[in-house]
Amino acid sequence: MTIKFASLILAGLGLGSGALGSVTFRREESSWTNDSLTSVFAQQAKGLFLPRTVISFQGQEWFENVTERWDIYAPPTFKVSVSPSTEKDVESAVKLAAKFKIPFLATGGRHGYGTTLGKLKNGLSIDLSLLNQFSIDSKAATITVGPGVRFRDIFTPLYEAGFQVPTGTCSCVGMIGATLGGGIGRLNGLDGLMIDALESARVVTADGRTLTVSEKENKDLFWGMRGAGQNFGVVVSATYKLKPLYAAGVWTNVDLIFSPDKNATYFDVVTSMEVPPQLTIASVVTYNATLDEPQLIATLTWTGPRDEALAAMKPILDVGPRHSEVTEATYATLPRVATFGTTDAVCAPGQIYDIYGVGLRRLDSAAWRSTFSKMARFYAAEPAGRASSILYETWPVQATVAVPDDATAYPWRDASTYVLIQMRWDRPGSPLERAADRLGAELRSDLSATGGYQGAGPAVYVNYAHGDERLEDIYGARKLPRLAKLKKQYDPGNVFRFHHALPTKYP
């Protein structure tokens, strides 16, 4: 049986993931004026696209909706947007941009971040939100999604069909965009990374061809797409292998708030725990405006019933939270109830997030306690920065490390915690920006120093990268020679370069 869905979005706001592919040509990004780009599309696009494909310009409502981003720190800027309604129209948009040497970024949901995206100025947006169809094939146990599909679109249909698939935790993120960097989340211990579920994809490459990549077709490119995919093309569809619901789709969510004096004990417990595949721990250093003090929020999830969950979580519960909420959920409802049901607030677009990330193989309680203390001092000194936070995602790794390291381009399979440092302030151009950015980089360095990876820099999940990292920090030195060869083969002109670009030669 095949179940098909198509929730057509006419004015998408905060639609999901980061850039699926970015292409630039031999003209300087800033050399295009509004009039020249408008002229190209007014004259050349006639009859090129199907009627449902939308061309929009700066100042128009559609344009503003489909170029609005979740993070407005160092964002790309655009003069024109094309919203293709078919795969063929994606190809046409790429070819038109190539012909006139127009730099562009293809986006599935605009949830991506990183300062390298901001190098695109006054370019073309290829908005993929209309390609939001997906189909579940129950017999084959697969789901095929378009680049406009977000995580929240698939949870209920999959649950009702009796399946699950690895996803991230933020429900508004685009599925394909998150996959290309690796795809971490709550099912990493049971089912592995999102790239481990990826069965095949259709990719528009730098020369305008659409290729199918899988273990049987274009296998070399398929390897590179799984961990560094933003460097090789625009993904117009992807098929994932599904697993039957674990524990009949029953989940238990426990949200906790700890007072600041508990941070040392809490971190001691979390960093010393053996995390079974059913358990996930998300720890957030944040600020409590009501009590005027820093605090720790923990979201613990368990794939199974309440009694099992509370037994597995007992070491953390024994630390003594000042507030707790236990919710019995399902695979479909968990993303909406987790972290006190704050998913809508977290997904609100148009906010400043200066993000630094680091992956940890070794968990050092002293380093974590130090980051709490530094954030507490920052909160006290900079009231305008109190929306800043540190998120520690401690995911189980059993299924992730069961996949051989050389099976995909992803370099950090044995990372047991991913840290997302989110420095925030109230408005662009704030004098707080320099101090906040400096602290973000410092915290990343502190955690990297005890994180268990060898090398001169941090081990950084590409989807959490800031933009100042070395290539080795993001892609891993052992992966780069093969990735560089693929880059030379499929994109020798380095046209896909706005998302932590790969070289065509390494070393």
Swiss-Prot record:
Phenotypic consequence of gene deletion: Impairs the production of pyriculol and pyriculariol, but accumulates their reduced forms dihydropyriculol and dihydropyriculariol.
Pathway named in the protein's UniProt entry: Polyketide biosynthesis
Up-regulation conditions: Expression is increased in rice-extract medium (REM) and is correlated with the production of pyriculol.
Catalytic activity: dihydropyriculol + A = pyriculol + AH2; dihydropyriculariol + A = pyriculariol + AH2
One Pfam assignment: FAD_binding_4
GO molecular function (one): FAD binding
Keywords tagged on the record: FAD, Flavoprotein, Glycoprotein, Oxidoreductase, Signal
EC number, as in UniProt: 1.-.-.-
Residues the record marks as carrying a glycan: N34, N65, N263, N288
InterPro entries, per database record: BBE (IPR012951), FAD-bd_PCMH (IPR016166), FAD-bd_PCMH-like_sf (IPR036318), FAD-bd_PCMH_sub2 (IPR016169), FAD-linked_Oxidoreductase (IPR050416), Oxid_FAD_bind_N (IPR006094)
Cofactor(s) required for function per UniProt: FAD
Presence of keyword Oxidoreductase: yes
Role noted for this protein: FAD-linked oxidoreductase; part of the gene cluster that mediates the biosynthesis of pyriculol and pyriculariol, two heptaketides that induce lesion formation upon application on rice leaves but are dispensable for pathogenicity. The highly reducing polyketide synthase synthesizes the heptaketide backbone of pyriculol and pyriculariol. Pyriculol and pyriculariol contain several hydroxyl moieties and double bonds, so it can be assumed that several reduction steps occur during biosynthesis.
Family as reported in the entry's similarity comment: Belongs to the oxygen-dependent FAD-linked oxidoreductase family.
Name the UniProt record assigns to this protein: FAD-linked oxidoreductase OXR1
Organism this protein belongs to: Pyricularia oryzae (strain 70-15 / ATCC MYA-4617 / FGSC 8958) (Rice blast fungus)
